[in-house]
Amino acid sequence: MRKTFLTLLCVSSAIAHAADEDITFHGTLLSPPTCSISGGKTIEVEFRDLIIDDINGNYGRKEVPYELTCDSTTRHPDWEMTLTWTGTQTSFNDAAIETDVPGFGIELQHDGQRFKLNTPLAINATDFTQKPKLEAVPVKASDAVLSDTNFSAYATLRVDYQ
């Protein structure tokens, strides 16, 4: 009986000395900044004259001149930034958009790699000097019969920051 009383006394003693402590939580909420490509202006890529027989997926390559800007210098390494390009895909190349000439398209590449349409490309959100080099490359279907004519194509390049 004495053991039971001593055990109860120890438990009661521990409960009698309990204390409450307050906890304070604080921090800063940040939203990703609004970003734009080339200040919202249309990016022009001029191919000039292309020799039809030389179009091979490498010939006529042109750099796509673009700039990324954000309305804040706040960058968080956990935020993800992506580039995506959209347009009407050719039937013969999933990284090329149709032009107004059947069987002829424009492929976009990033750093020498095919940039598939509607596929986000992760980019460095904290250092825009490391943005991917984009190049447009004329491509044609293997069975295309092209003739002398002007051509044009339209696509959208989008930056997302989350």
Curated annotation (Swiss-Prot):
Disruption phenotype: Deletion of the operon under classical laboratory conditions does not result in any major effect on E.coli capacity to form biofilms compared with the wild-type strain. One of its GO terms (cellular component) is pilus. GO terms for biological process: cell adhesion; cell adhesion involved in single-species biofilm formation. Induction: Expression is negatively regulated by H-NS and subjected to cAMP receptor protein (CRP)-mediated catabolite repression. Residues 1-18 form the signal peptide. The keyword Signal applies. Keywords: Signal. InterPro entries: Adhesion_dom_fimbrial (IPR000259), Adhesion_dom_fimbrial_sf (IPR036937), Adhesion_dom_sf (IPR008966), Bact_Fimbrial_Adh_Pro (IPR050263). Gene3D superfamilies: Fimbrial-type adhesion domain (2.60.40.1090). The operon is cryptic under classical laboratory conditions, but is functional when constitutively expressed. Part of the yfcOPQRSUV fimbrial operon. Could contribute to adhesion to various surfaces in specific environmental niches. Increases adhesion to eukaryotic T24 bladder epithelial cells in the absence of fim genes. Belongs to the fimbrial protein family. This is Uncharacterized fimbrial-like protein YfcQ. It comes from Escherichia coli (strain K12). The lineage of its organism: Bacteria, Pseudomonadati, Pseudomonadota, Gammaproteobacteria, Enterobacterales.
